[in-house]
């Protein structure tokens, strides 16, 4: 009986590891191979990749926030100051699935294309400033680097999706400008740590929104809301 249990446990662990590796490898795949000419990817495949990417980004951002919170901010009461102080708060976006379901899919796509580029600068500077932190855990830095890369890939994929769903639509140039770099470089430790905490809190919030929006959009556009 012990040998059967061991074989069964080993098989389950192997299956779990295989699924995790598949998810990570899919998330790291480019939309088109490097140097490809006239690359065509089906709308279903584009949405599949976008949903995997957005879920992966949200998972990483949640883990990074939790690691930073545990290491740097215990007992500082930052959560009470972080509410509604995100640089993307100026963008009108639904707060939950119920609100998102009331919005036309074209408007929801435009919202995604406003939020994603709003994170290009913050993520770039987040990586730079985390590198300069004393004793910054490798886990936090590696996640910041990966999120920055995957956010660019997701934006690229979303532009291709919009190109197929609404051909000829003008490129969306409306996004929220981030001006928080000086806060990440402040000499006062509490103020600087709060700036990092708030940025990671907002990243977790926005990545969760994007993840929900894309799952809803995939359900509507690919499965005609039958999911």
From Swiss-Prot:
Pfam families assigned: Hormone_1
UniProt modified residues of type Phosphoserine: 54, 62, 118
Top-level taxon: Eukaryota
Family membership: Belongs to the somatotropin/prolactin family.
Organism: Oryctolagus cuniculus
Membrane spanning residue stretches: none
Disulfide bonds: 32-39, 86-202, 219-227
The protein's role, per its UniProt record: Prolactin acts primarily on the mammary gland by promoting lactation.
Gene3D superfamilies: 1.20.1250.10
Leader peptide range in chain numbering: 1-28
PROSITE patterns according to UniProt: SOMATOTROPIN_1, SOMATOTROPIN_2
Coarse class of the protein's main subcellular location: secreted
Protein name, per record: Prolactin
Gene: PRL
Location(s), subcellular: Secreted
Gene Ontology terms for molecular function: hormone activity; prolactin receptor binding
Gene Ontology biological-process annotations: female pregnancy; lactation; positive regulation of cell population proliferation; positive regulation of lactation; positive regulation of receptor signaling pathway via JAK-STAT; response to nutrient levels
UniProtKB keywords: Disulfide bond, Hormone, Lactation, Phosphoprotein, Secreted, Signal
């Amino acid at each position: 009986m012990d040998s059967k249990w061991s074989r069964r446990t080993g098989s389950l662990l192997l299956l779990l590891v295989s699924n995790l590796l598949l998810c990570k490898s899919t998330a790291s795949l480019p939309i088109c191979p490097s140097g490809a000419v006239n690359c065509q990817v089906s709308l279903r495949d584009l949405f599949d990749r976008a949903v995997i990417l957005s879920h992966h980004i949200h998972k990483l951002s949640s883990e990074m926030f939790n690691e930073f919170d545990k290491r740097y901010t215990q007992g500082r009461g930052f959560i009470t100051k972080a509410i509604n102080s995100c640089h993307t708060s100026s963008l009108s976006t639904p707060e939950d699935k119920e609100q998102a379901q009331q919005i036309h899919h074209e408007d929801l796509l435009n919202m995604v294309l406003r939020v994603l580029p709003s994170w290009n600068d913050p993520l770039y500077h987040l990586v730079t400033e985390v590198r300069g932190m004393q004793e910054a855990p490798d886990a936090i830095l590696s996640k910041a680097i990966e999120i920055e890369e995957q956010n660019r890939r997701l934006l690229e994929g979303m532009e291709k999706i919009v190109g197929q769903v609404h051909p000829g639509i003008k490129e969306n140039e409306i996004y929220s400008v981030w001006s928080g770099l000086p806060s990440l470089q402040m000499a006062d430790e509490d103020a600087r740590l709060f700036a990092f905490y708030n940025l990671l809190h907002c990243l977790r919030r926005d990545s969760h929104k994007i993840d929900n929006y894309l799952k809803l959009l995939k359900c509507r556009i690919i499965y005609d809301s039958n999911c």
